[in-house]
């Protein structure tokens, strides 16, 4: 399986620029301290939301039910052996955020 690992900044809220399949996107990662989980969103190059507020759960295609022509064709997933992704798990290497191209 060929996939791209996407670095999740060690911040409670961040927006990163990324190029996927020849197009520019922005990914937003937000830590929900009250609930104890990560959320992510996809924005186009202008910062317009394509998908927002998706709870990051391990080993599940996070955008399975959210597909559009203007989004990257593939799935986003959190790869880990853990049952949930904690605040420091991406930074500590216990989890990876990945894009698997279709």
PLM features: what roles do these ranges have?
Residues 14-16, 38, 95:
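Short beta-strand/loop motifs in extracellular/secreted proteins, especially
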Residues 79-88:
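Short, surface-exposed beta-strand/turn "edge" patches of beta-sheet domains
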